[in-house]
Amino acid sequence: MSTDLHWQTQGQGPDLVLLHGWGMNGAVWQQVVERLELHFRLHVVDLPGYGHSAHLHAASLEEIAQQLLEHAPKQAIWVGWSLGGLVATHMALHHADYVSKLVTVASSPKFAAEARWRGIQPQVLSAFTEQLSEDFHTTVERFMALQAMGSPSARQDVKNLKQAVFSRPQPNPQSLLAGLQMLAEVDLRDHLPHLTMPMLRLYGRLDGLVPIKVAQDLEKVLPASEQFIFTQSSHAPFITEPESFCHQLLSFAGK
């Protein structure tokens, strides 16, 4: 069995890496891959523990990074969704020669809420952790529903997510647990000023996991970064508003 991560590479143009979120896999990008492959050489990865990389595992952001480094293109645009945004930001901070531009999608440097920081309530994350040990298939489905909640096309969004995710092998429970732990514990806020490359932050106005207040707070920390808010989207704007999403990436890449 391969010890390498599963990478899917297609298209022509500048290198662009797509990283999925917790409980998902690279198939979630399929809708936008069809549009973006005309403009970029795309590198879609299944992170350790997910999809075709389900037999692998990584317990921290740096362990994930080390596995990515084995086949990642240098000087690429990195696009990370949700937990994938934490991974992409970690790559940009610690392996900057691989990242020419950074794009985070519905992501936060700290997902768990605390006193003056908006985010996912810690009890929600601990409930997911408990449910995971009982029935991880249902837990992942619940998380999909939570991601789409609020979007006018929520039902269709969930259907698209399910179709994509269940088209590949199921994630391994150990990696799901490690991912939840990262969402609960990682805090990159103090490291963000060290980012040197251009950055674009994309958000869904209706997102219940990464509240729009996070976008405003990060504007102060990252004054040189750009941001865009998708008005009709919740946590998965590339599924709800794929054309607008691709437009944002193309515009940012061309700068």
UniProtKB/Swiss-Prot annotation:
The active site is at S82 (nucleophile), D207, H235. One of its GO terms (cellular component) is membrane. Monomer. This is Pimeloyl-[acyl-carrier protein] methyl ester esterase. It comes from Vibrio vulnificus (strain CMCP6). Keywords: Biotin biosynthesis, Cytoplasm, Hydrolase, Serine esterase. Signal peptide: none annotated. The physiological role of BioH is to remove the methyl group introduced by BioC when the pimeloyl moiety is complete. It allows to synthesize pimeloyl-ACP via the fatty acid synthetic pathway through the hydrolysis of the ester bonds of pimeloyl-ACP esters. Its EC number is 3.1.1.85. Residues 16-242 form the AB hydrolase-1 domain. It is found in: Cytoplasm. InterPro entries: AB_hydrolase_1, AB_hydrolase_fold, AB_hydrolase_sf, BioH. It comes from the Bacteria. Its main location: cytoplasm. The lineage of its organism: Bacteria, Pseudomonadati, Pseudomonadota, Gammaproteobacteria, Vibrionales. Pathway: Cofactor biosynthesis; biotin biosynthesis. It holds the Pfam family Abhydrolase_1. One of its GO terms (molecular function) is pimelyl-[acyl-carrier protein] methyl ester esterase activity.
